[in-house]
Amino acid sequence: EVEYVKWDATSDVHQPWGMSKEDYINLVKWCQDNYIDVVPLFQTFGHCGWMFPKDENGNFKNLDLAEDVNYPYAYNVSNPRLYPYIEKALDEVIEASGYPKYLHIGHDEVFHPKAEFPARPENKKLGIQKILYDDIMWYYNYANKHNMKIMMWHDLLVTPEESTENGAGGAPHNLAEVRKKLPKDITMAAWRYDGRPVDFPDITALRNEGFPLIGASWYEDNNIENLTKFCLKQ
C-alpha cells in the first residue's frame, strides 16, 4: 500500500511517518532481486483519508476534493482537478515500482457510517452506479495506456446474498449491476475475513462471469484454510 509514500506529486499531504520515495525504490529493487513481483496498492474512491490530512491549525486539507466535507473520506469525482492530481501521483508510483504488471486501485468500502456518499448535489444527480463505473474505467484506461492491468477489491460489486460478510452491491443502489458492464480482464481481489464460511458464492459468481480472481484472506481461525480450499476448486 503506497499512498503514504512521500511522492513528489503529493507533497501537500505528506505525513511525517510516511516512507521516503528513496526507501520505496530500494524496497522495490530488493523485491526484484529476489524474484518478487511488486503490485502497488494506491487507495482510491473510498479510504482516501491520505488526501485529507489536517494542517497545523487542525483544518482538513483538500476539502474541495472531498465528497463529504464534514467527514473527508471518499473523493469528489466531479472536481476537475481530481484525476490530474491522481494521474501525476500514479505516474510516479508506477515508475518507482519498476513499471509493474498490475496496479491495485483499492476501491472498496466507499460507504462510511460517518460520511454521506454521494453528498454533493452534482454527484447525487449522476447516481452512484455511474460514479462507480466511470471511476473504475478511468483507472482501467490509465492502466491500459501504461501496459498494465488493474486489480481491485470486490465488495462494492457483490450483493449481500453473494457475500453476507461484506457484499455492498445490493439495494438500494444495486452496485453489483455495474459488473455486467466492466471489462473482464479486471482482477477481482475477493477479501474475506470470517473464518466460518466454507462456501463463497461471491467468488463463484465472479469466476463464472469471467473475472480473474484472487482470494484475499485474513488471519481469523480457519479463514485462510477455508478460502484457499475453495479457491483451489474454482
What are these regions (language model features)?
Residues 1-186:
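Aromatic-lined carbohydrate-binding surfaces of glycoside hydrolases
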Residues 30, 205, 230:
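Hydrophobic/aromatic ligand-binding patch that stacks against planar heteroaromatic rings
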Residues 232-234:
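Conserved short secondary-structure transition element at the edge of the structured enzyme core
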